[in-house]
């Protein structure tokens, strides 16, 4: 609403909403749930093992012994690719992203299309955040996301706004995130601060290499006004 209807700068409004979300979650966990020690163990998803396939050495536990949301996320990749590049609705989204004024001349409602896209993307981002506590860490505490949303933005840029590319980018960045956890658990002779930095340093390095070559939608970040 702030960026679409009120036409506020998307970077500024996004940063403000991010700060509000951090403060609001901290408030709710203390006031509503009565949490005092800043950490709360939550009900969580258990891994789902695919019969026989999960017993395959090495790749079995990696591919066929994951949480249900992981399988849903993998299934969404081809579904979203088909929707975006092979359906009329996907063409409408692409058109509004490139030139909303031209889209309006052929009967497309740019504001409604943007609202639908923002709501769906926000729901998917929220599911990813929920999985962090419900599927991976099994607890909730302040600022546990630790900037992973910005890594997700980097994944979109790296993927050039393509769901298949986003899957590859997320596997790379997710692998870097997992590596820093594994490295600390293995007791590597590396200061843990450097291990914590690794996913973010890798993100910056990749953005430096591919960021200038990745061209997003022409109208991204630009408010639309009815003529």
Feature map (PLM): residue ranges:
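Helix-loop-helix "hairpin" substructures at the membrane interface of multi-pass membrane proteins
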Residues: 62-140, 163-168
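Transmembrane helix-bundle core of multi-pass membrane transporters
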Residues: 22-86, 187-195, 214, 221-227
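Hydrophobic/aromatic residues within transmembrane alpha-helices
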Residues: 2, 102-103, 172
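Hydrophobic core segments of alpha-helical transmembrane domains in multi-pass membrane transport
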Residues: 22-26, 72-83, 121-129, 152-155, ...
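Juxtamembrane/transmembrane-helix interface segments of polytopic membrane transporters
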Residues: 22-38, 125, 129-133, 137, ...
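Cytosolic-side transmembrane-helix boundaries in multi-pass membrane proteins
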Residues: 98, 105, 109-112, 183-227
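Short loop segments and helix-boundary regions at transmembrane helix junctions
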Residues: 1-52, 86-88, 146-147, 151-164
């Amino acid at each position: 609403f702030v960026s679409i209807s009120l036409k506020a700068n998307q970077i500024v409004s996004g940063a403000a909403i991010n700060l509000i979300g951090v403060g609001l979650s901290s408030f709710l966990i203390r006031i509503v749930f009565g949490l005092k020690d800043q950490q709360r163990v939550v009900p969580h998803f258990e891994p789902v093992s695919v019969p026989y396939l999960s017993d395959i050495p090495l790749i079995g536990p990696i591919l066929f012994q994951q949480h249900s949301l992981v399988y849903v996320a993998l299934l969404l990749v081809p579904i979203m690719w088909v929707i975006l590049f092979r359906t009329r609705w996907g063409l409408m989204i692409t058109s509004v992203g490139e030139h909303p004024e031209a889209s309006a001349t052929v009967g497309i409602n740019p504001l409604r299309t943007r609202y639908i896209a923002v709501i769906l993307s926000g729901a998917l981002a929220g599911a990813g955040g929920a999985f962090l506590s419900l599927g991976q860490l099994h607890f909730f505490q302040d600022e546990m996301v630790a900037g992973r949303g910005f890594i997700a933005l980097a994944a979109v840029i790296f993927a050039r706004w393509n769901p298949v590319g986003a899957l590859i980018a997320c596997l790379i960045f997710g692998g870097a995130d997992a590596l820093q956890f594994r490295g600390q658990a293995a007791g590597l002779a590396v200061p843990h601060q450097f291990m914590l930095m690794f996913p973010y340093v890798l993100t910056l390095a990749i953005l430096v290499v591919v960021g200038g070559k990745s061209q997003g939608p022409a109208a991204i970040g630009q408010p639309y006004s009815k003529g």
